[in-house]
Amino acid sequence: MNLKMKKLLNGETIISREPGNSMTPILKSRQPVQLEPATWEQVEKGEIVYCKVKGNYYTHKVYGKNKKRGCLIGNNHGHMNGWTKNVYGKVIKILPPK
């Protein structure tokens, strides 16, 4: 089990630093974000979530919601990762990059 996922499922608020440029300019590579626990039902279109899609973990945006399929997850450049109900947390604060 992924450590971030485990902490979020245990109700912890955590700091996460994900590598990559898929969320620029909103998030830079390894820019810290504060995540609080959330389920797919609790998040809204446009929010940034920590989730698992097709076996991969992402800090990406919610582009849509559907009762049968969950959330449509994608990066900030228009690439869609797919639908998932495996949402573990949402970004509540974007912290300054180091």
Regions found by a protein language model. Give the residues of each.
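Extended hydrophobic leader/signal-anchor segments used for secretion and membrane insertion
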Residues: 1-98
